[in-house]
């Protein structure tokens, strides 16, 4: 960890200044630019376990975990060893490989809704593909998504989206034709009556409904009791498909994802992050009768040059093997509760209004005194105060997501000592806000 007196980011500043002349905003993904929290973005050099080091050799305890995939900790030796062996055989084949079969079997065994799976290269690609599949299966065009839920940056999903769209305060995105989003209906998360009204007003037109079963891209927002069950009932009643976007929650909040955790089985599921072990990956899957429509078995076309590449498959296999060990999710649940409960207590003792919670290795903290059940509630947070909190923690060697509207993540590499150091830093920062 660093101290405020020794915290220097000279090299990060030099590299980021140069990057701004080479890439839009100096980054390859918007949230990395620290626009919503202010201050100098950090340029990383290397990672290991629960820690990251920047190019100025500052060390941080990391609660971003490359936005979720690093559930076993960064650069886990078993994953690295497996990748070295796979790398000796080549980086990509553009043809079937045995690793695809192994990872597919593991995913099918773990996720209740998945009987067949197709691998792609990102969560965005998975959600784009599953949307096409929903429409192909039902022969309907309209879909329902929820305000603040993020399903990647494809045109049809950039309507009241979360993640970077929420972070930057963008209403939607220029360049997206109205015709592209005219069939995208939105409802507030955790509002069953609003969903029912959409179904009633668009009878026999809605192909399906997609959501993050636990919102992570508008901050951490869990489903209210009965919400997921209610969506399952409504979709069945109106002949629509239910899709869980488990790119973030899959293998994160339970080995079988949110659908295992809450006991609600959707028709289709999208995955990413954890199943690639830190390498680019995505997947979508569901019932065989639906997945059989995907080419070459059926007429719905979808393809990818690097889909199912041996490196991503190898990293995913080894990561899931590590997660199968007894006690994995109990440990994540305990260490994360210790962290979030400590943060909430310290903030309130210092006189700050906060709200937050956790499920397994996923957590969130809002700077608001009101309960957060949806995106509108989340937007009431004091983002300026969060920005100051983020900077104070960064200067003390704690790396949090640089946005009030992103969930945080722990890993199996985080120790009680890491959490205690984090809480000590937070106590100091809360006293300065």
UniProtKB/Swiss-Prot annotation:
Cofactor: pyridoxal 5'-phosphate
Protein name: Glutamate-1-semialdehyde 2,1-aminomutase
Keyword hit for Nuclease: no
UniProt modified residues of type N6-(pyridoxal phosphate)lysine: 273
The protein's Enzyme Commission number: 5.4.3.8
GO molecular function, one term: glutamate-1-semialdehyde 2,1-aminomutase activity
Subunit structure: Homodimer.
PROSITE patterns: AA_TRANSFER_CLASS_3
SUPFAM superfamilies for this protein: PLP-dependent transferases
Catalytic activity from the UniProt record: (S)-4-amino-5-oxopentanoate = 5-aminolevulinate
Pathway: Porphyrin-containing compound metabolism; protoporphyrin-IX biosynthesis; 5-aminolevulinate from L-glutamyl-tRNA(Glu): step 2/2; Porphyrin-containing compound metabolism; chlorophyll biosynthesis
Keywords: Chlorophyll biosynthesis, Cytoplasm, Isomerase, Porphyrin biosynthesis, Pyridoxal phosphate
Pfam (any one): Aminotran_3
Family: Belongs to the class-III pyridoxal-phosphate-dependent aminotransferase family. HemL subfamily.
One Gene Ontology CC term in the entry: cytoplasm
Isomerase listed as a keyword: yes
Annotated compartments: Cytoplasm
Entry's Gene Ontology BP terms: chlorophyll biosynthetic process; protoporphyrinogen IX biosynthetic process
